[in-house]
Amino acid sequence: MCEFCVRQADDEDDGGAAASGRPNARTARYSRNYAGPFRKTPDRLLGMGLIRLYQLTLSGFVGNSCRHIPTCSEYGYEAIARHGLWAGGWMTLFRVARCGPGGTSGLDPVPEILSDGFRWWTPRRYLSLGRKRG
């Protein structure tokens, strides 16, 4: 067991600084961006880094006016983290295109798994991911 794991187990047993009123309670960590597991390849890190740079610099000037939940930059960050730069980039591009006037609005999460029909040579299929079905 690593040193951090041993300390965490001791804190939970002793009721130390990490303890709360409930037994085995975990502190909820809120993050603006996707915090789940993903493969940290160079292309994903580059794409996620560019989106994070946008969030920290230009997003404040543009304003918080996205029509979707999660916002387009959060969607892009998660799409690239889950599906890679190529698929996530196309998904993000089409999402930003849908965000303008006359586009969709509301809850539009990133799909957890893409079906077999989404291949690298068919980027037009990513256009159908966020469309409302009538």
Curated annotation (Swiss-Prot):
Residues annotated as signal peptide: none
Q: What is its main location?
A: membrane
Alphabetized, the UniProt keywords read: Cell inner membrane, Cell membrane, Membrane
Give the record's membrane topology.
Peripheral membrane protein
Q: Where in the cell is it found?
A: Cell inner membrane
GO cellular component annotations of the record: plasma membrane
Which InterPro entries does the UniProt entry name for this protein? Membr_insert_effic_factor_YidD (IPR002696)
What is this protein for, i.e. what is its function? Answer: Could be involved in insertion of integral membrane proteins into the membrane.
> Which family, according to UniProt?
Belongs to the UPF0161 family.
PANTHER family found in the cross-reference section: MEMBRANE PROTEIN INSERTION EFFICIENCY FACTOR-RELATED (PTHR33383:SF1)
Which NCBIfam families does the record cross-reference, listed alphabetically?
Answer: membrane protein insertion efficiency factor YidD
Q: What is this protein's name? A: Putative membrane protein insertion efficiency factor
Q: Which organism is it from?
A: Rhizobium etli (strain ATCC 51251 / DSM 11541 / JCM 21823 / NBRC 15573 / CFN 42)
